[in-house]
Curated annotation (Swiss-Prot):
Source organism (scientific name): Mus musculus
Bilayer disposition of the protein: Peripheral membrane protein
Protein name: FERM, ARHGEF and pleckstrin domain-containing protein 1
Domain notes: Intramolecular interaction between the DH domain and the PH domains can stabilize the protein in an autoinhibited conformation.
Lineage, highest ranks first: Eukaryota, Metazoa, Chordata, Craniata, Vertebrata
Modified residues (Phosphothreonine): T24, T886
Pfam families xrefs: FA (PF08736), FERM_C (PF09380), FERM_M (PF00373), FERM_N (PF09379), PH (PF00169), RhoGEF (PF00621)
Amino acid sequence: MGEIEQKPTPASRLGAPENSGISTLERGQKPPPTPSGKLMTVKIQMLDDTQEAFEVPQRAPGKVLFDAVCNHLNLVEGDYFGLEFPDHRKIVVWLDLLKPIVKQIRRPKHVVVKFVVKFFPPDHTQLQEELTRYLFALQVKQDLAQGRLTCNDTSAALLISHIVQSEIGDFDEALDREHLAKNKYVPQQDALEDRIMEFHHSHVGQTPAESDFQLLEVARRLEMYGIRLHPAKDREGTKINLAVANTGILVFQGFTKINAFNWAKVRKLSFKRKRFLIKLRPDVNSSYQDTLEFLMAGRDFCKSFWKICVEHHAFFRLFEEPKPKPKPVLFSRGSSFRFSGRTQKQVLDYVKEGGHKKVQFERKHSKIHSTRSLVSQPTAPNSEVPKQSPQSASLTFGEGTESPGGQSCQQAKETKACTLELGPHQSPALPKSPPGSKAADGTTVVPPEEEEEEEGGKDGIRPSNPQPPQPSTGSLTGSPHLSELSINSQGGAAPANVTLSPNLSPDNKQASPLISPLLNDQACPRTDDEEEGRRKRFPTDKAYYIAKEVSTTERTYLKDLEVIASWFQSTVSKEDSMPEALKSLIFPNFEPLHKFHTNFLKEIEQRLALWEGRSNAHVRGDYQRIGDVMLKNIQGMKHLAAHLWKHSEALEALETSIKGSRRLEHFCRDFELQKVCYLPLNTFLLRPLHRLMHYKHVLERLCKHHPPNHADFRDCRAALAEITEMVAQLHGTMIKMENFQKLHELKKDLIGIDNLVTPGREFIRLGSLSKLSGKGLQQRMFFLFNDVLLYTSRGLTASNQFKVHGQLPLYGMTIEESEEEWGVPHCLTLRGQRQSIIVAASSRSEMEKWMEDIQMAIDLAEKSNGPTPELLASSPPDNKSPDEATAADQESEDDLSASRTSLERQAPHRGNTMVHVCWHRSTSVSMVDFSIAVENQLSGNLLRKFKNSNGWQKLWVVFTNFCLFFYKSHQDSHPLASLPLLGYSLTIPSESENIHKDYVFKLHFKSHVYYFRAESEYTFERWMEVIRSATSSASRAHILSHKESHLY
């Protein structure tokens, strides 16, 4: 990582000398070997709000990281502290000292681990070290500011006065007022200012160490000292909060303690799913054993609280760490979690028995010398205690400090790197296990009376991680021509990834998502030198590559026209399933377009051939332009406007005919399953309208690129004016037809619903949310329209469709955040006139998107004529087969866990629709996103490379509908594989990946990594632009303004 500046650590700011680690091993013991392998960097936020970066081996247990932090702080009594972080489910948990770090902190770059107090002893005099008491004082200060430590005004003022005394010394009215103005210790501090100064005046002569001691003396008497509330409900459904302390388990209503269960009374702690159970010991006069039951938000919240209780019981009640449970011979039951570390008694004995010496040091904002105990260690002959000025020696709260190099720290938020390496052949130096441990590795187990009563299956669907990673390969799509579909689940700051590739096989072998035999490394071999030489013959002018984009996308557009004009027409002619009136409306309006654009493509390719220098015409420069070709053909398109106007009518007529004819419905469904129909059929009917918009964007780029005096500028500007006029005329039709097409597409994914497509209804957003029900959080697909919100589940139906469970009219609905109320991250409460539901999103950003769109839809509904008509069908629709209806009716809450493994069934329904992708990735897509996707279509040749391969493979790639479709060449009639991009990360390879090529971008999720090479800087930027539109979504305000400036 290079040289790291030596900035003061929290311990050095207290004046503690640096040492090589405090040995806590028994005499004669050796430290356990440090795991070798790749290092990972973990950011730790200290109690003074600074951040430190630690490098530890990925496979090392959590104890390695925790000991590294304690060693960095020179902290002897580290057992009172812990490391907490939000896991992949967004639940704040403690770092398990026995499990590998990489299995707990899955995305260390995006997680900040907090070093905080974990165990609060009943008496602060049990804390032997001044540094320990100082860190406890910082924790009290933090809890005050965050509202965790609630108390009356007098207690708050007294606490703050001790903090001020330790920070700035004796009372001085002017200095006090200035300091209190700059530092806010509680939210309503202004009203307490006079009382704070009154108390501070009485602390004259009190040293910082004495101030910390007095601060803890006051704090420990408060009811909420060291209390962390966990939302729950009792058997009657009353909302309460559970907490654990050194004395036992506490029950709060709000911030008022209403009950307590002392450890001496507790016989057993367990949990089943989301039920937390406390078995009490029988009274002296009774043999009856009472069992108390509390309901928490979900299984993960319940297990997290159970672990905290186990650790508190072991730390405060046991004399030594519990012995490991013997491993079962055949079957195991319960959790493998166990307490690891020293108990409080062991910590007290160790500090009392250890050899210590007094060392002088300087404290923050004070020149008073104090003493601190350190384990006796040999010191270098010339070593000195570091001396620091009050400005640079203090823990920084709101002011910068200067490092030795002269760089300013950003208000105590700087990140320091602590590389734990002693030398080129040494493992990181870390503190070792404490004496009193029965084993060198510090392994412990939970006492038998605290075992977990966990049922065999892990049920329940968690909002931020709906499916564990599956090593097998499987098909999400019902289309046999799609060789692959890889999916991952998002999370805010994000979340765990899931791979769902073709044909879930029973052998559970990991396969690459792109498994088509024509897409492997052996196919289409090309050496890098050959490719480089070929690319260098191309012109370097950006206008050439813009013109080439017209050519490549025109090829794809022509193929899309052939789907209707050739393939669909040929299939229809073989079967008498379509009315003649419908045939005459569709095909005569596509054939002229196909003929025109075939000639248009030939002209563009001829011009590019001349531009590339395959004749001597390019010497004169007459053919190094494209504007004249664009102007001529766009003027020709205006004569085809009558056919373009008919496409909306054809789409409506087709859907009307399908609704009235079951035979035509089955015919169209069968055609959609053919390889050539890689998108929903009705999407191809709108392609001509979409293409006009693409011409407009290309001409805008050309006009922006050319200077006004360029030979091609005038033609490009004239062509842009012509196409802009056509787009403006079709703008209203486009908006209407996109919504109409999307409603009919959604209708095919839903069962149990009537009249979804009605005049005036507009689709707004679809996506996956978790609904809180009697069985916990259950995954549901939600569909938001401008008048109603539907929620569905995916059951074990033969068609892979989603069954509608309920509808919530938006008229009169309210929406509010309820994360604190239910203790579920990213939680919302939707209150309708007839029904209220609680849902949770997979991330904060997802929650905000839903809140924004639902509120907008509510506002639209309020302006309408009133409540929406009933949508739910009382019986399955007539056009569904009896088998489908029966299977749909049998779907229940209990089917949901099984529905996730039902992907291996081949269904007659398309399985690669955006509804299914959003279901598996726990994300959402809005109608605005679909509109943006229409504008961001691209195709062309790319070189593809797998993570572990050497050669590059040339593929023809089409990006449309949030997905990459792969072809062996542009002449292929259908794609060989597809890759939906929702949830993927788009980056540029780092130097460590050894790509060493220009214009390379990287797509990755989980262990799947793909590298793609473009042929020029322009094409590289264009691929990055369009793919980024699918892997990230902008805010609604930004997108609406974008659409207004690009009317179509």
